[in-house]
A protein has these predicted regions:
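Short S/T/G/P-rich N-terminal loop/turn motif that feeds into the first structured element of a domain
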Residues: 1-94
């Protein structure tokens, strides 16, 4: 099992809106075990979205599916306007 963690620094005042949109995006893409979190400590305006995949190949399939799924693309519309920077990490559960 792999956890996919997408980490964003939202524009000031946009963290709540970004968190809500990431939840919608996860549901639209039928991601497994989607979790959206906002900061209590650390960097300000930090929003994290995590979900599970069985393997790196499943992750790759999801990325290709996302690129061609109109429902997922519609849910993501405008979300890049809500954050300034971000990164993705994949973790293997041991």
């Amino acid at each position: 099992m792999i956890i996919v963690r997408n980490s964003f620094i939202a524009r000031p005042g946009q963290a709540g809106k970004l968190a809500a949109q990431l939840k919608e995006m996860g549901n639209a893409a039928s991601l497994r075990n989607v979790r959206v979190m906002t900061d209590l400590t650390g960097d300000f305006n930090h929003v994290i979205m995590e979900h599970d995949v069985e393997s790196a190949s499943e992750f790759e399939q999801l990325m290709m599916q996302y690129a061609s799924d109109p429902k997922a693309r519609e849910a993501a519309k405008g979300y890049t306007d809500l954050w300034t920077t971000g990164h993705r990490e994949l973790f293997r559960i041991v």
